[in-house]
């Protein structure tokens, strides 16, 4: 079983997309193809106002795990054609104010014995 929760920030109000990578390649655990311009992703977060944090959360059972060492990671993109930095564990402003915070993200892998 694999699950992740990631807090991200972006300095624009577009959707963000999470992609699960297994062994350095995009996982097949991804949305179905729709229209030719639609993104396919493992997770998504609805765009909010600039400088606000968003949450990506996902959980799945990997039923054909490898018996050798395997790397898992999550990568993010956004729905804007311009270049924007995606911030992990804080919003894009990262101000030193009482109304801003830093967060924690997790990637958990549980091995289940038969």
Stretch-by-stretch model annotation:
Residues 1-69, 73-114:
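Terminal beta-strand-rich extracellular "head" domains
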